[in-house]
Amino acid sequence: MSNQSLSSKILGGNLVLRIAVGLVLGICLALVSPDAAKSVGVLGQFFVKSLRAIAPILVFVLVMASIANKEVGSDSRLKPILVMYVLGTFVAAVTAVILSYLFPTTLELVTSPEGLAPPQGVGEVLKTVVFNLVDNPLGAITNGNFIGILAWSIGLGIALRHAAPSTKVMLNDISDAVSFVVKVVIAFAPIGVFGLVAETMATNGADAFIGYARLLAVLLGAMAIVAFILNPLLVYWKIRRNPYPLTITCLRESGVTAFFTRSSAANIPVNMGLAKRLGIKEEIYSIAIPLGANINMAGAAITITVLTLAAAYTQGIVPDFSTAVLLSIVASICACGASGVAGGSLLLIPLACSLFNIPNDVAAQVIGVGFIIGVIQDSAETALNSSTDVLFTAAVSMSDEKNN
């Protein structure tokens, strides 16, 4: 009973509110006493180091368990929905790349390594990816080689699809255990944000927050373009009539709820209720909605892409178009692994950053920046992710009814 009480105290409460309080307190301390603000920077450094420690094992276990246990139905009616999910996520990543090119954003990081060697075009990037793919799995986890981690987790996940049910249950249990550790780490985000903001403000001044505001504007701009322009275009492609009544309904009845719950998984019952009211067959939405909560991650793809390119620009790296397209693909794949994990999209940023040879300590600092703006970013990301689940499911269902 005492353990439950302790867990509830650590993990309970409104995380968004606590992060906002940490943000404000960090700014106030930096303004009142810059020296003290630099001293509490150790709290932010400890938080970032915790994120660096948990990210490799999180990616490895989560992807492996997800693939090993994934049971996608053979019903052909799900295939068009899956196509919409994948296409929507990729289009979102490409949109984020374009906006990042139009409005390049740099960040004020606490430290930045000297002598960083950026990759020379997509050829070098692909060479790095291929060599990282065949890294020793233990070495990949130890050294934070996320490409190698992803390769091994996918390979083992595919192999374990044929394992005994008890093995799959064990994988799920391990995945749940790692996710719990992640939740504990994320629960200390307000303290970490307090330290990061205080040290950044004391070291770099108010200019740091101009970069944060610009970054947030690019993120929200990309999400708005996807929600109000590109998603309706994809829906029109399926139903061949005005897509906005359906789009607005999904944003109002699903997106608003998801904005405040900040959890696609928690919003599944809301989406199922909306799908039922829209007249979608239960045998379709009962599978498509939970599946979408796991793999339909347009908002996460935008977050990963924008923050990765911000990290690249901060290090003086300007990716060429081919590398940016590769990033869009990687971000789309990463986004599918972000579901069900607090701060999941942020914790997968190091994987995308590895395309540009950006060190893990820089990527971890970018994760910290993500938590600073996460009060708004995470809510908007979840609203886009979750509302799109029911939007695409409804669009495909309406298209099938029209054709039949």
Curated annotation (Swiss-Prot):
Identify the InterPro entries for this entry.
Na-dicarboxylate_symporter (IPR001991), Na:dicarbo_symporter_sf (IPR036458), Ser_Thr_transp_SstT (IPR023025)
Primary location: membrane
Give the membrane topology, semicolon-separated if more than one: Multi-pass membrane protein
Question: GO molecular function of the protein, one example?
Answer: neutral L-amino acid:sodium symporter activity
One GO biological process term: threonine transport
Q: Which domain of life is it from?
A: Bacteria
GO annotation, cellular component aspect: plasma membrane
- Which is a Pfam family this sequence falls into? SDF
Q: Does the keyword Membrane apply?
A: yes
* Catalytic activity as recorded in UniProt: L-serine(in) + Na(+)(in) = L-serine(out) + Na(+)(out); L-threonine(in) + Na(+)(in) = L-threonine(out) + Na(+)(out)
Q: Which UniProt keywords apply?
A: Amino-acid transport, Cell inner membrane, Cell membrane, Membrane, Symport, Transmembrane, Transmembrane helix, Transport
User: What transmembrane ranges does the database entry give?
Assistant: 10-30, 53-73, 81-101, 140-160, 177-197, 215-235, 287-307, 329-349
Q: What does this protein do?
A: Involved in the import of serine and threonine into the cell, with the concomitant import of sodium (symport system).
Q: Which family does it belong to?
A: Belongs to the dicarboxylate/amino acid:cation symporter (DAACS) (TC 2.A.23) family.
- PANTHER family assigned: PROTON/GLUTAMATE-ASPARTATE SYMPORTER (PTHR42865), SERINE_THREONINE TRANSPORTER SSTT (PTHR42865:SF8)
HAMAP family recorded: Ser_Thr_transp_SstT
Which protein, by its recorded name, is this?
Answer: Serine/threonine transporter SstT
The record lists the organism as Glaesserella parasuis serovar 5 (strain SH0165)
Query: What is the phylogenetic placement of the source species in the record?
Result: Bacteria, Pseudomonadati, Pseudomonadota, Gammaproteobacteria, Pasteurellales
